Amino acid sequence: MEEFKMTVWTNGKAIRKYTGQDKHPDTNPSKRMEWFKATAIIKPDTGDNNERD
């Protein structure tokens, strides 16, 4: 498995798929301020558990 980038929308409680469009997942304008775009690099597990957040 290769590493890959994954971009999602998050509000700290939920994660929604980012479809490539810069549109917030909520249509309600007051809720749009709560969503942030986040990008992560997903890497295969190498068995080295020394890295911790």
Curated annotation (Swiss-Prot):
Keywords for this protein: Host-virus interaction, Inhibition of host innate immune response by virus, Viral immunoevasion
Keyword set includes Cell division: no
The keyword NADP belongs to this UniProt entry's keyword annotation: no
Mutant lacking the gene: phenotype: Knockout of this gene prevents the phage to overcome the host Hachiman defense.
Domain of life the protein comes from: Viruses
Gene Ontology process terms (BP): symbiont-mediated suppression of host innate immune response
Assembly description: Homodimer.
Reported function: Counteracts the host Hachiman antiviral defense system.
Protein name, entry field: Hachiman anti-defense 1
